[in-house]
Regions:
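Conserved beta-loop-beta/alpha segment of the NTase-like Rossmann-fold superfamily
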Residues: 1-51, 80, 88-89
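Catalytic-core segments of class I nucleotidyltransferases/pyrophosphorylases
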Residues: 55-126, 135-138, 142-146
C-alpha cells in the first residue's frame, strides 16, 4: 500500500518502538492540504489528539464527522506492535462500523483503553502515499520521476 516508504523510515519506526518499549509505535503524516498528488490522503484515517497531544483515536474517514475530516494529521497505517500484546488482543476486534469491516486502527483504541502507550513518528508525506488505484499509481510515479 505504501510503496515509497524507505528502509530508513522502517528502521526509525522499529528503533523508536524498541527504545520506548510501548505497545504500539505508528507513523503519522501531517499534510499541508488534500490537493494535487496529496488528494489520496483525504481517504486516510484522521489522528484525533487531546489538548496535550496524546492520541485519543484514529478514525476512518468513512466514519468521521465533517469536522474530523478537516484534520490534516493522517494515519498511513504503518505500525509496529509489541507482538505479545498484539496476539492477546487481535480477537477483541469488532466490525461494528459503517462498513462492517474489521479495522486494524481499532487496535489503537484498545491500546488507549488499556492505558498502554502509543509512540508516533512523523514521516515524509511522499513516503506515505498509498497506491490502490490507477490514479494513485500515477501520483506515486510522478513523485519518482524527476522533472526536467
Amino acid at each position: 500500500d505504501n510503496p515509497l516508504v524507505t528502509p530508513k523510515t522502517i528502521q526509525k519506526l522499529a528503533k523508536t518502538h524498541l527504545k520506548d518499549a510501548v505497545a504500539l509505535t505508528m507513523a503519522v503524516v501531517k499534510v499541508s492540504n488534500f490537493n494535487d498528488w496529496r488528494r489520496s490522503f483525504y481517504s486516510f484515517g484522521r489522528i484525533i489528539r487531546d489538548s496535550k497531544g496524546k492520541i485519543l483515536k484514529s478514525i476512518e474517514v468513512k466514519d468521521a464527522t465533517l469536522e474530523q475530516r478537516k484534520i490534516r494529521e493522517v494515519n498511513p497505517s504503518i505500525y509496529c506492535f509489541n507482538a505479545s500484546w498484539l496476539w492477546k488482543n487481535l480477537e477483541k476486534l469488532k466490525n461494528t462500523n459503517i462498513q462492517g469491516e474489521f479495522y486494524l486502527t481499532d487496535l489503537l483504541e484498545l491500546v488507549i483503553n488499556q492505558k498502554k502507550s502509543i509512540e508516533t513518528i512523523r514521516i515524509n508525506t511522499k513516503e506515505a502515499i498509498g497506491v490502490n488505484t490507477e490514479d494513485q499509481l500515477a501520483d506515486a510515479e510522478s513523485l519518482l520521476t524527476p522533472t526536467l
